[in-house]
């Protein structure tokens, strides 16, 4: 049985863009690579999501991907009473930048318990307070996940909104659901056609094969 390709998969979105170009008899599509179109899709997905969330709206679950299990290592006890500093062994892919912070949505231990997400400053003060010094807190720094808290963690899971969704796993499924709501895909395609392909189509070339300089800039 053949694998079913999701209508909102990355392959389906790329194929749809090329199909529309061919249907429009645009010869420039012959020189356009799938890699370039894919990068535009990631770029405008991030743009649309940022535009949506910077208005203060709730995060659409369709935006979110899960990373992990992610191994973390104890690095020191300095500044963490009764606990440790942890750091992820691997560098994390880039999360989108939002007005209120990063696209890091949630961190969980392997039992599904939520770990508070903050920043480095908040983590520093939390570990010095009487009633919160034994609570875990996680934050991003230099593309790694850092955690402060008791010495019982080894793996965590992360939920977040990545700039490039294909970086969420070593083997991304191009035929699986792409992390964007289906109703946002037409807007994403229109942005690519208007902002990118029109630029390509107006590159100075003489396609009329005549002696006049009638190329539009």
Residue ranges and their predicted role:
Residues 2-217:
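Glycine-enriched, solvent-exposed interface loops adjoining structured elements
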């Amino acid at each position: 049985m053949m694998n079913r390709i999701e209508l909102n998969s990355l392959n389906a979105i790329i194929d749809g863009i090329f199909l529309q170009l061919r249907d429009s008899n645009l010869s420039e599509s012959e020189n356009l690579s799938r890699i370039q179109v894919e990068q535009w899709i990631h770029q405008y997905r991030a743009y649309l999501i940022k535009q949506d969330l910077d208005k203060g709206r709730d995060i659409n679950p369709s935006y979110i991907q899960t990373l992990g299990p992610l191994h973390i290592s104890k690095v020191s006890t300095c500044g963490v009473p009764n606990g440790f500093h942890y750091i992820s062994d691997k560098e994390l892919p880039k999360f989108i930048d939002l007005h209120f912070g990063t696209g890091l949505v949630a961190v969980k231990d392997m039992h599904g318990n939520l770990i508070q997400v903050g920043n480095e400053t908040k983590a520093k003060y939390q570990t010095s307070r009487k009633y919160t010094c034994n609570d875990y807190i996680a934050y991003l720094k230099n593309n790694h996940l850092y955690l402060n808290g008791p010495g019982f963690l080894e793996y965590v899971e992360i939920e977040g909104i990545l700039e490039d969704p294909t970086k969420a796993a070593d083997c991304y499924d191009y035929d699986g659901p792409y992390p964007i709501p289906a109703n946002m895909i037409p807007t994403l395609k229109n942005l690519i056609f208007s902002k990118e392909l029109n630029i390509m189509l107006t590159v100075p070339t003489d396609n009329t094969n005549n002696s006049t300089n009638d190329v539009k800039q």
